[in-house]
Every structure is written in structure tokens, then in C-alpha cells.
From Swiss-Prot:
The gene is rpl23-A. One of its GO terms (molecular function) is rRNA binding. It comes from the Eukaryota. This is Large ribosomal subunit protein uL23cz/uL23cy. It comes from Selaginella uncinata. Residues 22-32 have a biased composition (Polar residues).
């Protein structure tokens, strides 16, 4: 999608769609405004808020547990959508969700 890389499937992220929130990893460079414009290209999707934070880089491990460098820092976005404006996860289902 350009900016948004993949959805996140952590314990917290699995509970977020109940509150019309979606969590995803994003490229580190785009701003919240740029990501908002890209997501709102979906038909009938309107965003209320975007929260973002950078995840720690962490150590890259080599063989035998030796530290060989640092992994790239990631950005995580939590997007809140307007009521009745869900992201269509399952096309053809009511409100984009399986009943």
C-alpha cells in the first residue's frame, strides 16, 4: 500500500478491531498525514486518529549467540476509523467482518 507494510497480530492487535482500530507496521519515513491519505484511498474508509511509535531496534544475533549488529528500527501505526467505515478485510461480508 506504500507506507503500510503488514498488519500486526499480537494479543493487543487482535482485540483492536472491536474498537474500530487496526495495528500495522509501517515504513519509518512517511508521516501520519501521508499514511492517512494512503489508507483513505479505500472506498468508504475515514480515519479519526493515527497513533504511531517506533519499536526498539534490537540486536541482530549471529551464530552461537554473538551480537553482530543492530536490526532496523520499525514504526508501528494504530489507526482509529470512524464508526461504520471499516477497512474491508473480508469483501462481500457485512461491514467487512465475518459474523
Amino acid at each position: 500500500m506504500g507506507g503500510v507494510e503488514n498488519p500486526v497480530s499480537t494479543d493487543k492487535a487482535i482485540r483492536l478491531p472491536e474498537r474500530k482500530q487496526y495495528s500495522s507496521n509501517a515504513e519509518p519515513n512517511p508521516s501520519k498525514t501521508e499514511v492517512k491519505r494512503r489508507i483513505e484511498r479505500f472506498p468508504r474508509v475515514r480515519i479519526v486518529a493515527i497513533n504511531s511509535h517506533r519499536l526498539p531496534a534490537g540486536a541482530a544475533r549471529g551464530s552461537a549467540g554473538s551480537v553482530t549488529g543492530r536490526r532496523v528500527r520499525r514504526k508501528r501505526m494504530i489507526t482509529t476509523l470512524r464508526l461504520n467505515h471499516p477497512i474491508p478485510l473480508f469483501p462481500g461480508k457485512q461491514n467487512g467482518f465475518v459474523s
